[in-house]
């Protein structure tokens, strides 16, 4: 089953200090919608609390740091306790905000079993992303997102087209629910510069398409 690291929601610096004393360092200070920062001191924790609260509001989440590998699972629940498919990924590269910038497909039996148990208990309907720390057979749920992640095309590229399966399920069509994919497939996100005119750029902003 999924385990949860000690997690406390705080709404003031006084509550932050109490949570920090209970959890101990290192720990994470996280926004309710976005951003997570690993901190080592109370000064760092207080600074990140103020920064996150100013952007994302309260409460701010304080969470114990857990040792292990950062693994993610993306999938789709059928709403009846089953799964329309899932893909496990190990993070190999992170952005400055801790988001996955690169990853490699893995298959971790304990993590798959924990994800399947979650879908069964919650009767989960629709897409999901589980962000986990895995140490041996211990699987700690760090975050759950009720949506497809930005890297969902990676799952389709390795043979498990989750968005297509979701649409088929919604339409009442037969869905291939296998989760067969090759372990060791890798993706790396990158960016590039586009050169254009101001007129064309403004047209995209105002019309939503190029002319």
PLM ranges: what are they?
Residues 42, 105, 109, 156-161:
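Short, conserved loop/turn and helix-capping segments at secondary-structure boundaries
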Residues 55-56, 98-141, 145-147:
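A long amphipathic alpha-helix within ATP-dependent nucleotide-binding catalytic cores
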Residues 72-75:
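Short beta-strand scaffold segments in enzyme catalytic cores
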Residues 77-83, 134-137:
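Short acidic-glycine loop/turn motifs at beta-strand connectors
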Residues 85-89:
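A glycine-rich, hydrophobic loop/mini-helix early in the fold
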């Amino acid at each position: 089953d999924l385990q949860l690291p000690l997690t406390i929601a705080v709404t003031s610096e006084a509550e932050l200090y109490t949570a920090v004393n209970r959890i101990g360092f290192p720990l994470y200070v996280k926004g309710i919608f976005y951003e997570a920062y690993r901190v080592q001191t109370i000064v760092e924790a207080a600074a990140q609390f103020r920064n996150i609260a100013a952007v994302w509001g309260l409460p701010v989440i304080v969470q114990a740091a857990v040792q292990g590998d950062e693994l993610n699972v993306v999938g789709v629940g059928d709403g009846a306790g089953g799964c329309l498919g899932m893909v496990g990924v190990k993070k190999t590269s992170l952005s400055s905000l801790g988001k996955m910038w690169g990853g490699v497909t893995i298959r971790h039996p304990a993590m798959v079993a924990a994800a399947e148990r979650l879908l069964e208990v919650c009767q989960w309907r629709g897409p999901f992303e589980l962000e986990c720390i895995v140490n041996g057979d211990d699987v700690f749920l760090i975050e759950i997102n009720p949506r497809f992640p930005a890297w969902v095309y990676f799952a389709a590229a390795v043979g498990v087209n989750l968005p297509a399966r979701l649409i088929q399920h919604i339409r009442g069509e037969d869905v291939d629910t296998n989760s067969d994919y090759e372990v060791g497939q890798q993706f790396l996100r990158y960016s590039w510069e586009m050169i254009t005119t101001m007129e064309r750029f403004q047209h995209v902003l105002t019309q939503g398409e190029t002319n």
